[in-house]
Amino acid sequence: MQTFNLTRLNFHSPYKVWAEDNEYKFITDYEVSYRIIFSPNNDIWKEGAYEFGIFNENQKISPNDPKVKGTVEAIIEEFFLTNPNILLYQCETGDNRQAMRARLFAKWFNEYENKSRFFIKVSVLHDDDIDNYIALIVQKSNPELNNILQTFNDFI
């Protein structure tokens, strides 16, 4: 994965983002510390797919902060500007709040001003009585879009 252009990213991000150990971090006005990761995911495709993760590092309760949404959008936008790849997002299941996270992510995406550039598909995988929500995000301009969607559907 190509490293992000932090100058460009921070121009668009409400919160200042910095890179640390191949991760991206920011702290909110409410002192909530977030860590964003992009990990190669070879479960569906052999290459070119990354899994996106958002982690509340200090476990502080995060109020409804629109600047978090704007920062996450800027980070995802920067991902696609530097890496025209496939992005997967799987909601964390440890606290049984994955459905809420999936709804929030879908809401953020539906409100995103550049959403017409992207294709998103959210699916639910049932595994051992746990619902796993996974989202596929890919640019509509990707020449392999139809193959990517077919492969994702076959996997699900």
Language-model regions, residue ranges each:
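Non-catalytic substrate-recognition and accessory regions of acyl/acetyltransferase enzymes
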Residues: 1-156
